[in-house]
Amino acid sequence: MSRSDTDGRDTSFASRNGVGGSQLSEPPSQRRERPDYGYAVEETHRPHTAQERFPDSHGQRSAPDLYSRDSDRFSYHRGDTLTPAQERSYQRELELMKARGEQERSYGGASASRSSRPLEADHHYGGMPLTRGLVDDFAPEPMASSGRPNLEGFSRVENGRRYRLVVVQHPSRARMCGFGDKDRRPLSPTLIVKLIITEEATGEEISPCEVNTSLFLLATDLCHPDDLMLAPRNILVHHHASSLSSNPIQHGGAGGYATDEFGHRSGSSLGNFAADGGGPCDDGYRSSTHPQHASESTGAAALPLSSSSMNPYDRSPHASSSIQFGGGGNFAQQSQAESYTRNLVGAAVASASVLKDEQDKWCTFFVFQDISVRTEGVYRIKLMFVNLEVSGRVGTGVADALAETYTDAFTVYSPRRFPGMLDPTPLSRKLASQGIKIPVRNDKKKQRRRNDEGGDGMGDYDGASGGDEDDE
C-alpha cells in the first residue's frame, strides 16, 4: 500500500471520531503538526494491524473468530455507507450468530464450555448426534457376548432336525505320551459322546435306527481350560537353530547358483520341490536336502536352504536359513528351523456307532478310546459334529458344524506324578461288550492269569486294544 492511501485512511479515521479539523482537503503533514491531533480518549493507543486495516472475508477468518460475539471486527456505523463486500460480510456474521444461538438453545449450552476433547453434542452424522463409542476415536464396537464361544456350545437345525451333543463320560486324567511314534496313553475314563437328534417342530427324539449315521463325524481339538478364545493347544512349535562355519568352494561358473561338491548345479539345494517345479513338496515323511553338500560361489546372494524335520510323525517342517559371507572369504551358515507337532495324537476324529446304553436303549455314540496328549497340563477337548450327507453339498469337501460342546477340564500328568488309571465305568463295560475297543480289565481273567505259573496277569482287556497296567 502506498503512503497516500495510508494518509487517506488516517484522515477518514480522525474525522469519524471527531478529532482534528473537519477539512478533508488539509494535507496530512500539516494536520499531524496540530496539538489536538491524536486518538480519542476511549481509544487504546496501539498500532493498527493488518486485519484491522483491511477486514478479511469470511473464508479467510479462522474458525474461532466466527463464533466470537464481542469481536469489534465488524462494528459498522449506521450513518456510513457500506460497500457490497462489507454488506455481504455483515450478513454472514448475523447468520452465524443466529445459528450459534439456535445451537446453544437446542443443546442446553453444551458447546459454550469447550474442552480439548469434543462432546457428543458437537458431533453429528446425518443430523443425528453420535454415540460416545463413535466419538472416542471411532473405536470398533466390542464383540458381542453371544459371539464368544461358551462351554455350552451350540446346537443347529438342518432339514427340520436339531442336532445336539451330550458328553456322557468326561475324562479326568491321563498320562503324557511324550514325543514317541508308537507310545499311546489313553484318557481315563474313555471319552464318550452321545448325539441326540430331535424334530424341531415337535421336539420328539428321533431313533438312531431311522437315521443314516454312516457319514456322521465328530472331530476333537485341545483348548485352554478357562479362556476358549486363546490359541488352540493342539500345536507345539519347535525351534531349531544351528551355525556352521567353513570355507567356500570356488567355482568358475556364474554366481547365483548352488553347486554340489562335484561342481554341478543343484536346484534341490534351494528347497524340496515337486517334480513339476510348481511348489514345495508337502510330504512330511520325506527328508529334504543336506546343507553340507551345498555351497555358494563368490559374489552370490543369500539363498534359502531347507532342513529336514527331526521326527516325521505328525509334523509339518518349515525351515529357513541364510548364508553370510565374511571379509576373509569364510562364511557362516545360520539356520532357523521350525517344526510343528500335534499335541493331541491318535484317532482324533471318530465315526458314529449305534449301540445300546446301560438301559438297553439304542443311541448314537462317539467313542474316543485311542487319543493321547503329548505334554502335561490342564486341557479341555472341543467337540464338533458334522454331517457329510447334507443335501446339495455332497462331494464339495466343505461341511458346516451342526453341534459343538466341550468336555470338563482334565489333567495330563508326567510319568512320575501320574496317579494311575481309573476303574472302568459301567458304560465303558457295556460298550466294550458290544465290540467297541475300550481298555476294560476283566478281573476273572486277570486272577486266573496270575494263578497260572507262566502268566503275569498283564494286559487282560476285553475289547482288546491295549491299556497300561504298569501305571497302577
Curated annotation (Swiss-Prot):
Region (Disordered): 1-121, 281-327, 433-472
GO CC annotations, alphabetized: cytoplasm; nucleus
Compartments in which it is found: Nucleus; Cytoplasm
Annotated Velvet domain residues: 158-441
Gene3D superfamilies registered for this protein in UniProt: Velvet domain
Amino acid composition bias (Low complexity), ranges on this chain: 106-116
One Pfam entry name: Velvet
Feature: compositional bias, Basic and acidic residues: 1-10, 29-59, 67-80, 89-105
Keywords associated with the record: Cytoplasm, Nucleus, Sporulation, Transcription, Transcription regulation, Virulence
Composition skew (Gly residues), residue ranges: 456-466
An annotated GO BP: sporulation resulting in formation of a cellular spore
Biased composition annotated in UniProt, kind: Polar residues: 286-298
Alphabetized InterPro entries for the sequence: Velvet, Velvet_dom, Velvet_dom_sf
Domain of life: Eukaryota
UniProt similarity note: Belongs to the velvet family. VelB subfamily.
Subunit structure, as described in the record: Component of the heterotrimeric velvet complex composed of laeA, veA and velB; VeA acting as a bridging protein between laeA and velB. Forms a heterodimeric complex with vosA; the formation of the velB-vosA complex is light-dependent.
Protein's job: Component of the velvet transcription factor complex that controls sexual/asexual developmental ratio in response to light, promoting sexual development in the darkness while stimulating asexual sporulation under illumination. The velvet complex acts as a global regulator for secondary metabolite gene expression. Component of the velB-VosA heterodimeric complex that plays a dual role in activating genes associated with spore maturation and repressing certain development-associated genes.
Name used for this protein in its record: Velvet complex subunit umv2
Organism per entry: Mycosarcoma maydis
Upper lineage: Eukaryota, Fungi, Dikarya, Basidiomycota, Ustilaginomycotina
